[in-house]
From Swiss-Prot:
UniProt domain KRAB: residue ranges: 62-133
Subcellular location: Nucleus
Predominant localisation class: nucleus
Entry's family note: Belongs to the krueppel C2H2-type zinc-finger protein family.
Annotated protein name in UniProt: Zinc finger protein 606
The keyword ATP-binding is assigned to this record: no
A Pfam family annotated for this UniProt entry: zf-C2H2
GO BP annotation list: regulation of transcription by RNA polymerase II
UniProt KW keywords: DNA-binding, Metal-binding, Nucleus, Repeat, Repressor, Transcription, Transcription regulation, Zinc, Zinc-finger
Mapped zinc finger ranges (C2H2-type): 289-311, 317-344, 400-422, 428-450, 456-478, 484-506, 512-534, 540-562, 568-590, 596-618, 624-646, 652-674, 680-702, 708-730, 736-758, 764-786
Length: 792
């Protein structure tokens, strides 16, 4: 049966943790995280006796007035929309539960108003004189709640209780209403009840202390944090029995902010938060807390509260050191790792620091029969399992084997996670995008991509990161540390994953295979980028020109074309580059290194991309075909250049003379005409050229090499362009036509000379007689006449 307890209704308005299945006010109180949770067998009945509450009270009929929560107009105005909606839902649901259990009651006017969507405060009884008799009756009729009080130090069974601080909603209500007289009377009544409760609590705990503290599974211990809204701050100082093997600490049944434990043999300070998890309920499998939004049940009110925070967006956990807040305890529990070194478990005798062990576990070291010592480092462990795992880190022992693939692990938790890679199990799902993960930590990291949270900040440059591992690697930029060294070539890396990827260049391993075309890759990121070629996906867009890219690195490189940034500078000549790969390739021009060799002909190249393009020549594959003329090309860039012959596009323009070119290399060579630069020099005759292709063709005049042969007549040429022009003699093709007389030519140079006849231009002038000619060949013929005249 759902909750009909007034405390649950009020708790819903403060914590949004409603839905408890309890009728007994003591049971509800025990479940609520703001109050002590007596989950020792029989402690509820003892609690009733200690406070004078009759055990038979739970059998009396419950009226609507017993469970209703009222607000004044002033208080109602202080509630926001979410709180008002929650109040309306709780009141209507509570009234429905009363009817469902057979209570024959008339419908209260407040329920009628809430059902019609009207304000409830209009039906509340007026309180003009601020006497608040309704609240006094509620206080007298309900279970007594400890008020906010501070007690002097008391001694009992080796424990000293210094102070209690409790949150009390009824106390707050009286304080808001200004009921001073009722407040003073309330304090007097509560002080008596508190003394009875403290006495009863110590009696119970003196008998049960060893049971609680001996069960390590009953508590979830974390470092120096408390839920900011749910948990009251309670500060205890305990001194245990020196000869006892278990610690007597009554914090076992409540939340603790700071606990200081002292022992004559050891001195240790522990910052911990202890959360009761109700073992009896876990054993029976009962899920007492049900969420109406997701139809999900929980056996722990803390887990239920975490889950409700997902729906509401409420962030209930605050870390005291940095005041960062979280809506789930797992994320909250991981956060203290950022503050490593601040809250540590320090055991002075052995000077060991414990991050994962609680002081309750470590105290076992004090007894000889329970101490496990690792001789190598003189480190001591409270459990032999910890010793076994610790020893494995030095012996390289991996005792946890997986039979499917033969992989071994040091920790059993690693084995459990690894098994999920075989089963495909991904139980942790992102609420934002639906992406699933194998472990909770991966989900937590992923969620930061949605929230934008970057909690890990570099103390050197202030740069922030979403993941702690990224911060650790980033810090190596400042320190210059590269701890991962390749055993083959001695190259160092600051990422272990980079070393693993680098080692594949030595082994030739390519474990990542494309399911579409079968192509393999050394890096998973390369496979992911390759897969986008098949899908056409380009998720990375430039903000300047809206151009899209398959991977982020390509976008980063492209953005430098807008900014003009060239961060990579050559130390030899000072030349700068936008891309690091271009700098690496450029540096090989200084060293002469050509590490990429063709296995077919042995030709070497400075860049892998140049080798890949060259290898296509041997394969004969020409996958890129022109849709205009059907011509095939081995490279996409060649096809693009070829298509410009059809479109007439010449995108590369000279800023000196305005002449345009279809290829960028032609523009570069043309600019050297203006500058007079001829960087390509022949070693045989010292002749220089402004284009490398001209030098290559010239060298063949010395060697006599003519690699381009005509299949029709067998004539050979030293340039491919000369062969193309020659082939037109066999085919009769004359692609170059004059716009004036429609005359056609097989060579472009012949068309240019012909067009000068129409324009009258004669740019070639004889140096002997000054006569001008339209073509260079005509000038050469004329100059031969002068030579013959001189001979005669």
């Amino acid at each position: 049966m759902a909750a009909i307890n007034p405390w649950a209704s009020w708790g819903a308005l403060t914590d949004q943790s409603w839905g408890m299945t309890a009728v007994d006010p003591w049971a509800s109180w025990a479940l609520c995280p703001q109050y002590p949770a007596w989950h020792v067998e029989g402690s509820l009945e003892e609690g009733r006796r200690a406070t004078g509450l009759p055990a038979a009270q739970v059998q009396e009929p419950v009226t609507f007035k017993d469970v209703a929560v009222d607000f004044t107009q002033e208080e109602w105005g202080q509630l926001d929309l979410v709180q008002r909606t929650l109040y309306r839902d709780v009141m209507l649901e509570t009234y429905g539960h009363l009817l469902s259990v057979g209570n024959q009651i008339a419908k209260p006017e407040v329920i009628s108003l809430l059902e019609q969507g009207e304000e409830p405060w209009s039906v509340e009884q007026a309180c003009p004189q601020r006497t608040c008799p309704e609240w006094v009756r509620n206080l007298e009729s309900k279970a007594l709640i400890p008020a906010q009080s501070i007690f002097e130090e008391e001694q009992s069974h080796g424990m000293k209780l210094e102070r209690y601080i409790w949150d009390d909603p009824w106390f707050s209500r009286l304080e808001v209403l200004g009921c001073k007289d009722q407040l003073e009377m309330y304090h007097m009544n509560q002080s008596t009840a508190m003394r009875q409760m403290v006495f009863m609590q110590k009696q119970v705990l003196s008998q049960r202390s060893s049971e609680f503290c001996g069960l390590g599974a009953e508590f979830s211990q974390n470092l120096n944090f408390v839920p900011s809204q749910r948990v009251s701050q309670i500060e205890h100082f305990y001194k245990p029995d020196t000869h006892a093997q278990s610690w007597r600490c009554d914090s076992a049944i409540m939340y603790a902010d700071k606990v200081t434990c002292e022992n004559n043999d050891y001195d240790k300070t522990v910052y911990q938060s202890i959360q009761p998890i109700y073992p009896a309920r876990i054993q029976t499998g009962d899920n007492l807390f049900k969420c109406t939004d997701a139809v999900k049940s929980f056996n722990h009110i803390i887990h239920f509260g975490d889950h409700k925070g997902i729906h509401t967006g409420e962030k209930l956990y605050e870390y005291k050191e940095c005041h960062q807040i979280f809506n789930q305890s797992p994320s909250f529990n991981e956060h203290p790792r950022l503050h490593v070194g601040e809250n540590q478990y320090n055991y002075k005798e052995y000077e060991n620091i414990f991050y994962f062990s609680s002081f309750m576990e470590h105290q076992k070291i004090g007894t000889v029969e329970k101490a496990y010592k690792y001789n190598e480092w003189e480190k001591v462990f409270g459990y032999d399992s910890f010793l076994t795992q610790h020893t494995s880190t030095y012996t390289a022992e991996k005792p946890y084997d997986y039979n499917e693939c033969g992989t071994s692990f040091i920790w059993s938790s690693y084995l459990i996670q690894h098994k999920k890679t075989h089963t495909g199990e991904k139980p942790y799902e992102c609420d934002k995008c639906g992406k699933v993960f194998r472990n909770r930590s991966a989900l937590t990291k992923h969620e930061r991509t949605h929230t934008g949270i970057k909690p890990y900040e570099c103390n050197k440059c202030g740069k922030a990161f979403s993941w702690n591992s990224h911060l650790i690697v980033h810090k190596r930029i400042h320190t210059g540390e590269k701890p991962y060294v390749c055993n083959e070539c001695g190259k160092s890396f600051n990422w272990n994953s980079h070393l693993i990827g680098h080692q594949r260049t030595h082994t030739g391993e390519k474990p990542f295979e494309c399911t579409e075309c079968g192509k393999s890759f050394s890096w998973s990121s390369h496979l992911i980028a390759h897969m986008r070629m098949h899908t056409g996906e380009k998720p990375f867009k430039c903000d300047e020109c809206e151009k899209a890219f398959r991977d982020y690195s390509a976008l980063s490189k492209h953005e430098r074309t807008h900014s003009g940034a060239k961060p990579y500078k050559c130390t030899e000549c000072g030349k700068s580059f936008s891309w690091s790969s271009h700098l690496i390739a450029h540096q090989r021009t200084h060293t002469g290194e050509k590490p990429y060799n063709c296995q077919e002909c042995g030709k070497a190249f400075r860049e892998r991309s140049a080798l890949t393009k060259h290898e296509i020549i041997h394969s004969g594959i020409k996958p890129y075909e022109c849709n205009k003329c059907g011509k095939s090309c081995s490279q996409m860039a060649h096809l693009v250049r070829h298509q410009r012959t059809h479109t007439g596009e010449k995108p590369y323009e000279c800023n000196k003379c305005g002449k345009s070119f279809s290829q960028s290399c032609h523009l570069v060579a043309h600019r050297r005409i203006h500058t007079g630069e001829k960087p390509y020099k022949c070693n045989q005759c010292e002749r220089s050229f402004n284009c490398s292709s001209h030098l290559i063709a010239h060298r063949r005049t010395h060697t006599g090499e003519k690699p381009y042969r005509c299949n029709e007549c067998g004539k050979a040429f030293n340039e491919s362009s000369s062969l193309i022009v020659h082939l037109r003699n066999h085919t009769g093709e004359k692609p170059y036509k004059c716009n004036h007389c429609e005359k056609a030519f097989c060579k472009n140079s012949s068309l240019i000379i012909h067009q000068r006849m129409h324009s009258g231009e004669k740019r070639f002038i004889c140096s002997e007689c000054g006569k001008a000619f339209s073509g260079h060949s005509a000038l050469l013929q004329h100059q031969r006449n002068h030579s013959e005249e001189k001979l005669n």
